[in-house]
Every structure is written in structure tokens, then in C-alpha cells.
Amino acid sequence: MNLSKRWLHDYVNLDVSDQQFADDMTLSGSKVESFETEGADIKNVIVGKVVSLVKHPDSDHLWICQIDVGAKDNIQIVTGAQNLKVNDVVPVAMDDSFVSGGHHIKKGKLRGVESNGMLCSLGELGLTIHDFPYAIEDGIFVLGDDCDKTLGKDIHEAIGLDDVITEFEITSNRADCLSITGLAREAAATFDSKLVIPEPAGKKTHGDVNDFLSVEIKEPSLCYRYAGAVVENVRVKPSPRWMRERLRACGVRPINNIVDITNFVMLEYGQPMHAFDLRYLDGHKVIVRKALDGEKITTLDGVERALKPEMLVIADENKPVAVAGVMGGEYSGIMDDTTTIVFESAMFNGVSVRRTAKALGMRTEASARYEKELDATGCLRSLKRALQLVEELDAGDIVGGVVDCDHSDKTPVTLPFEPEWVNNFIGIDVSAEEQKKILEKIDFKVENGVITAPSFRNDIEHQADISEEIARFYGYDKIPDRALSGVADGRYTDRQKLEKLVTDVMLSEGLSEVCTYTFISPKQYDKLRLPADSPRRDSVKIMNPLGEDTSIMRTTAVPSMLDVLSRNYNNRNPKAAMFEIAVSFKPRGTEELPEEPKNIVIGLYGEEYDYFTLKGVIEELLCKTGITDYDIERVTDDPILHPGRAARITVGGKTLALLGEVHPETAKNFSIGTRCYVAEVSMDVLFENAGAEKVYTPLPKFPAVTRDLAFVCDKSVPVVSLEKEIQSAVGKTLENITLFDVYEGNQIESGKKSVAFSLKLRSKDKTLTDDDADSAMKKAIKAIEKLGATLRS
């Protein structure tokens, strides 16, 4: 937001340097990016008058001019301009001067004739014909009656090119500061000066606006207020110099008096406005509605745009005439032959305007303001200000009254006045009276222990916001430095300790940690082959997604891990072993935030990895977390996993982990052309069952005995069942049991499989004999016979 110093002084009188103004405004919360004086690169250019014009003897297009610059002697300048005549008052760049763009002007000779400077065009002063409409674009700028023609006067002062422009960075929560009056209010409070913003009022009116215009709002949830006024006998002409100067200083190009009035009011009050040519408004009716399917509009920039049904438009009885809050239609613009206009001052839903502007690729000054949710109470005041300017500029005849359709919520924001809370929160000691005074300087009301925020401060929501206002104008530099009191007790929580342990175990097992987005596409569930009614498809939907690929929150991190494996596989990495402690999201209804469980997701592929590698990683994790009592069962009905190479680990009836080889179809859907393996381990179940303490086990004093056993059993018998029977039968003497072979094929009966275990036996009290080991083996063989298994011969 550019602020004109000259315009600012219309509302608040400040006697401070430009640097101090920038520093103090920044300190009070209105950040100044930069400030500069208009035409600062133009130096030693003054006002002069053409005394005589003589043809150059050696040129058919050059003129020798004698110029009076208010000095004792005239100066001679040679020019090629063809628009000059005697007595014209012009800008004169003297010897050793600089014009716009940093061009250095020195005296010299043109075809043998001395020239002691240069006569300037608008472009050489950094201006255009929009700044001085009566000037000639490609000729010397001849000063008009709206300029100071005192000879020898600095050109900056003569043509009003001496304003100081301050650029502010306005944050999204302070839409009120996207206006001159808003920044004037901040400046008045910062420098403790009087703020004067006159209430706009017009005097001359005729007729009744209802005879010219009617308004209907069909979408009150998207258009909170719409006010309109009519001006007849419009006299389209250039705006006066003072208005053009202010618009130029704020970065807006002057066009004509009617358009300039709408831009002037937008800059002054922060309320976007638009002027419609009434003759192109069919039925003389304004209808605020959503666009119809397939509807199009050609906007003021001459581009035809296809509208979508969710976009809000301003329409007449037959067609859209403007994209609400963004830009007017081609035929809504003001032309030289316009006679009757409608001024629009409205309040639209910020989210709707932002989405429309983004979809159409046309972010404008108006949409940039509407996006930030403006003050609906400002609509009428802005409309009255526009009518006042019409009267002041003699731009037309105002029709009496305004049409005002108001659906806005006028409930003010109120908060308790708690000075002590503010002091404790900020760390200052400011009296209640002083706090009240600060708030009243920025138009807050404090009565009976209640603070009422002004309608233009829609960013005020909490007591902390009030504290910020107090701190801003009390002075951040006055808040004393104070060391933090108390002792910071920095410790890991039990869950954080577990996560750290999990990470350490995974890294020690050779896995690399990854971090993936929690946003995914619904199509990922199709790639996982999840049924349409699967609970894992019940996702939290994003209201404003970056795109379809990031439109929902994942309920499982498996697709994210498979994407990582796919990326590595297709980059020709021969193997990958990854893990992530990943967050998933499970909806809990529209009134509650979603549940956010964490799971350990593991992904493997490569020749050296198989199902048992994955199982071994999880078993190591369970060992390190002290979980020894768990069950493993085969899984055949999970669409993600291979039906013959998947398992579920449960603890106390709760699923701790799901692991296995990825189903070939699922792997294909993720463009993985090799066997890959995934596991998902519940951090919640792991935390609930992790051992609280580690039990010390002394180093063994006696040697171990190792025996191998191979059994033949039905293919349907789970290996874990065999392991448990052996462990139960052998007892404490069994130190460890390891599965080292599963075989099906030749020499094994159909429907059967061979399972081989290695048993490690050790006693705490003695060295085991062969008889001891044989006795343990007999117990193991007898135990598995309960499951229909027999010792393989």
C-alpha cells in the first residue's frame, strides 16, 4: 500500500521527518518497506518561458530557442520539438542536470549551434498524459494553468511532483489499513495527533433513485450488502490536478473523473467501488447471483472469460455485467458518451472473491481488498463520499437517495476490559486509565468494563489482540527486558522416548527414515485395491486443497510408503529399506477434530529382503520394547497384501502390526516391478504394551546346546503355533528358538509342509548333558503332535 504524504496531511497534521515517520510507524506495527520523494532522480530542472523561436540554419526540423528562466540572461537551447510557440512555459533541464531515468544533460552543440540544456517532455519527467491530459505525448510539455508558472521555479514544486510516497507492508488481518484513512488513524495514534475525517455529505440532489434502479440479492451468504446510487447528466472529463496527483502517488493511473472518483474512494476509505453505464443495464435492475452454467463475460480488459456456477456475478435481467468483487464487464465501463451511471458500493464474501479471482487469473486492487473481509458499514459512507466528489467536480447531477440492500451482521465484537491481565501478559505496568486512552485513540470504546471493537477491526477476537493494541501504542521499545523466570524442565515424554527408541531400532536394522506428505489423492485408495465400503476410505476432506492429488488426509501411510518405494525403484535403485513414524487421520464427525494416530510404516524391496526380513525387524522392535507375549496369525483377506505371505501381530486382542508382501496387483498399481514388503505398526498399541523397565540378565556361566528339529505338518498350521507349543513344553531351558526352513515339494506329501527349527538350550545352574538335551527334544516332539505334526525322517 502506497501512502501519499500530501494526502495523509488532509486528515492528520504531522511535524516529523520522513525517516522518523517510517521508524515510528514500523515500531507501532505498520511496517514501512520504503519511502521516496517523487521525481527524486530529476535534478536542476526549472520553469522557463520561450522568448523566441528561430529555424536552425543547417536543419529543416531543429529550432533555436531563447528561454527566460528568471535569471539575468536568457539561455539558448536547440530543440527538435514542433509543438512550441513563443510565450509557452516549459520545463527546462539546465546544464549539468538530470532527468527521469538518471540521464545526464550537459551543454553542447547541435549542428554547430550551442545548446545550453534541454526542454523536457512528460516522459523525461517520469510522467504520462494521464497525469496531464492536455499535454502532447510526443512533444515538449507545455505547462497549463494548473501549474505554477513562476520562472526559475524548481519543476517539482511547479507541477506538484514533490510528494513523499511511503510504501507499507499491510498484513492480511489489517484490511482497514489498505486505505489512506486507515493509515491516518494509525499515524494519529502513533504520534498522538488529532485525526480529522469529515463525514461525507452532498447537498444538490433531484428525483428518486428508486425510479432509476432496483437491486435484488439472491445470494445473501456471498453478498452481505449492496448499495447503489444514480448520477444523471454525467460530464466525463479529466479529473483536477489534486486528484490526479493523489492517484499517481498511490500507484493508480488517472483515467477520467468518474473512474477516478471510484479509485479515489477505494484508496481513501478502502472500499472498492464500480460505476456502471445505466444504458447497458437491462431493466435498470441489479441482480447479485451465481453464474449460470456455461455463462461467459467479457471483462473490462477485453478478455472473454468462462464463468463457473460457483462464481458470484452482478447481472441485469438478461446477462452478467460484472464479476462480483473482481472486475466489471466490458459494457459496464464509462465512455465519453455516457450520460447516466450507477455507483456500486458492496460487500462480498472474501473467500468467494479470492477463489473467483484465482480461477479467472485476474487479481485486482478490488479483489485484493475483498479477500481480506472489509467492513460492511463502510459501504454507505463510501457511496456518499463518491457522490460528494461528483458534486465537487461538477461531474453530473445526483439523483436523490440510495438503494441499500443490507444483510450484514452488525453485532460488534466485545471483550472484557482487564488491565491487570494485559499487564501480566505483556510484562508492563500501565494504568487502566492509560490503557483506556490508548484504545480510544484507535476508535475502540471502553464502557462499564467492556471493550467494543470498531466495525472495521474484524481481526479482534481474543484478549491477546487487545494486549497487542496496548503494546503497539504504549511502545514496544518501552517494554523492559526481562529474563525468563523459573526453570525450564526439558524432558522427553514417555511417548517421545518410545518414538526415539523406535527410530534407533529402525536405524540399527539398516532402514532409512523418510518423511511424506499427509495429504493424498482419493485415487491412492484405488491403487491399494480397497473395497468401496472400506473404512480406510473414510477420509478427512480438505476444504481448499492445492489440487486433487492433495485433497484428503490419509487414513493409512501405506500408499505414501509405496510411493517412496516406487520412486526409488523407478530411479533404478537396486534396493530400498525405509521407515516413517507417520501420522494418519480418522474423522470423528463434523463437530470434532479428527483423531490423529501415529503408526510405524516400514517398506522394503530388493533381492536380500523377504517376508522374514520384515518380520525380523518387527521382532527386534518388540524385543527392544519389552513385548514378549504376542500372537501371530496368517492374514488372507487384506487387499493390500499377498494372501499367502501376510500376517497380523496381536497383543492382548489388539492389532499391533500388519505385515507382509505387497499384493502383485497393488505393486503394479504403484509401478513397482519387483516383490516389495510393507508393515504398519500401531504406536498406540506399542506404547500401551511396551515394558516399563529393563530386567538385568547376568551373562551365562554354562555353555549352550543346539539341536535342530524338522517336522511335517498340514500347510494350514501356523508356524507360530508350533513355536508356542515347543516353548511351552521345553520351558525355561529353551533360551531361543529360530525357524530356519520351510519346505514344500518333492518328498513331502501333498497338502503338507516341512518346518525346521533350531533350538538353543541352556541352564542357569549346570552344564546340560546329552540326556538333558534329548529329554527336551522328546518334550518338544510330543507337544507338536497335538497339532498333527510328526518328526520328519
Protein language model regions, located:
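Phosphate-backbone binding interfaces of nucleic-acid-interacting proteins
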Residues: 1-207, 342, 361, 365, ...
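Extended, well-folded interaction surfaces typified by the phenylalanyl-tRNA synthetase beta subunit core
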Residues: 182, 415-574, 707, 760-762, ...
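A carboxyl-terminal module marker
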Residues: 2, 19, 27, 441-443, ...
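Glycine/proline-enriched, intrinsically flexible loops and inter-domain linkers
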Residues: 4-5, 23, 63, 196-295, ...
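Conserved mixed alpha/beta core segments that line enzyme active sites in large multi-domain catalysts
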Residues: 47-76, 245, 256, 262-331
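Terminal amphipathic helices with adjacent charged low-complexity linkers/tails
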Residues: 187, 191-217, 394-422, 428-429, ...
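Mobile "lid/hinge" segments at catalytic clefts and subdomain interfaces of large enzymes
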Residues: 114-131, 135-141, 164, 314-410, ...
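Beta-rich nucleic-acid/ligand-interaction surfaces
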Residues: 40-43, 203-205, 487-493, 516-535, ...
